[in-house]
Amino acid sequence: MDTILWILQGALAVVFLGSGIAKSTMSRERMIATGQTGIALFPMPVVRVTAASELLAAGGLLLPWATGIAPWLTPTAAAGLCVVMVGAAWSHSKLHEPQNVAANGLFFAAALAVAIGRLAML
């Protein structure tokens, strides 16, 4: 189980590191052009706060558990990503993008598995 959780944590960290960097550095138009269409419904300050949340979560998925320093932050980061994915799914649903809603559901499920799995190991 530990190996599966590490794989999920690593995959989620890579995805959300990339997404967070994109949301923190790109213009609205460029994000939409590169596939980050869900941001269209939100003002840029919300997008930038989401970017910061994704970047912090990417680190929180790996570093606390790997170092043993405040390991409770790992399931907390995963739970935070679940909240982000609910917002993303809502946004893509409003934009009638079922494939993106499904992808958000997959990321939600992976983050939930990490949150529950790591919480059980505390």
Predicted regions and their residues:
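Membrane-interface extramembranous regions
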Residues: 1-122
